[in-house]
Amino acid sequence: MPKLKVKKGDMVLVIAGKDKDKKGKIVQVLPKENRVVVEGVNIVKRHTRPNPKLPQGGIVEKEAPIHVSNVMVICPSCGKPTRVGKKFLADGKKIRVCKKCGESLDR
């Protein structure tokens, strides 16, 4: 299974599906399922029973995971959606880089 090139906190652009062209921050990464949860994207309605957390129950809207192939990382320096590359620093540390401008994506 290939390693995911996105991390929690990355800004991404949705490139396919019902929420195409929406931007959002990654809230959660699910590496075993190759999916990510993006803030404000793929909102679904869940019908919940009354429970201690939600005493009245009802319909709750929440974000559902989308496949990682449907999102592209937005480079913080050039602001464009880009593919992610890897680069080794002089001290042997591996970082993620923007394929368009070559700048680091890691904070």
Swiss-Prot record:
Q: Which GO terms describe its molecular function?
A: rRNA binding; structural constituent of ribosome
> What Gene Ontology terms describe where this protein resides (cellular component)?
ribonucleoprotein complex; ribosome
Q: Which domain of life is it from?
A: Bacteria
Classification via InterPro entries: KOW (IPR005824), Rib_uL2_dom2 (IPR014722), Ribosomal_uL24 (IPR003256), Ribosomal_uL24_KOW (IPR041988), Translation_prot_SH3-like_sf (IPR008991)
Q: Which GO terms describe its biological process?
A: translation
Q: Which Pfam families match?
A: KOW, ribosomal_L24
UniProtKB keywords: Ribonucleoprotein, Ribosomal protein, RNA-binding, rRNA-binding
- Name the CDD domains on file: KOW_RPL26
Which HAMAP family does this chain map to? Ribosomal_uL24_B
Q: How does it assemble?
A: Part of the 50S ribosomal subunit.
**What biological function has been recorded for the protein in this entry?**
One of two assembly initiator proteins, it binds directly to the 5'-end of the 23S rRNA, where it nucleates assembly of the 50S subunit.
Q: Which PANTHER family match?
A: MITOCHONDRIAL RIBOSOMAL PROTEIN L24
Question: What family does the entry list?
Answer: Belongs to the universal ribosomal protein uL24 family.
The name this protein carries in UniProt is Large ribosomal subunit protein uL24
Name of encoding gene: rplX
